[in-house]
Amino acid sequence: MDPSQNPRDLCQIYLEKFMVISNYRSLSFKKQKYLVIDKLSNYNNTDYRDVLQVNGYFTYCVQKNKLDAIQYLYENNLMNPENKSQLFKIAIVHGNIDVLKLVIDYGIDVSLDDHFAITVCTRPISNTENIIQLLIDNGADVTSNNNLPIKFAILKGTINKSVLDLLINNGADIHADEYFCAKYAAKCCYIFALKYIINLGIDVNMENGILLKNVLSDTAYSSNEYTYSCIKTLLENGADISFLDDNDTLKMCRGSKTRNILILLLDYGFDISFINEYQVKDSSKLSEINKILDQGIDPIKFILFTNEI
């Protein structure tokens, strides 16, 4: 896989593979055992029915921890390389470390399918840390595809300190690809990940305040609580608000739902005097407001009333 490809696109490819494997239906063990054994004896990977039945049987064995059934397939030479690969990936997706140990003992290459296992196992699955360590002990590369495993962990929701620690202690670079993880954590308001990366000593003012700008960029679409927490964390760790321009904060000045964020920035000295230079695009609106104020209405109370601050 091309490591220069956009990390988000790469992660999406692995996520799609993950979802395909996780959707194999678990088949009845008693009803399917002999049928599947027969199919494995004459396996046709171009027949989707064969593929679904075999992988469904593998899924059942993994979910129910049927180690004896899996051993039977190996000992009777019923597993071709493709079947072995699929069983391994199904065990990864379902987090079954017993099956993983078994297929590793039978010689599976843990880096198959362009390091699928070490990448997707950073998602929240059972035995995450033990599985990562098992893969590393058997040759998995946590820096594969330009450190994609740790990017996948950040992008796809494994906000888990022990998992991130394990990856980093085994060589993963969370600052790879021009601090992609930090920038993405800020943009998506992943507060734990952002704090974790800051604690590693990152420059919160990198690239002219890109982290603070990233947090503010999707304010309208993210949770106000997480946005506020991320901005507060950056400011408390020395983020310089002078990097912000008028466009970065204009929407917060206009929206009552983001007023708490605006107040937070003001507490740190943010200057919004540019509002005085605002040019009214629709003069009719200005005349409407003036007509209302001519009734003796207090401008401050009018703002409070109409914006429900």
From Swiss-Prot:
Q: Which PROSITE patterns match?
A: ANK_REP_REGION, ANK_REPEAT
Any keyword Repeat? yes
Question: Where, in residue numbers, are the ANK repeats?
Answer: 53-82, 83-112, 114-144, 145-176, 177-206, 214-243, 245-274
Keyword terms, alphabetized: ANK repeat, Repeat
Highest taxon, organism lineage: Viruses
Q: Which SUPFAM superfamilies match?
A: Ankyrin repeat
Query: What's this protein's name?
Result: Putative ankyrin repeat protein R603
Which species does the entry assign this protein to?
Acanthamoeba polyphaga mimivirus (APMV)
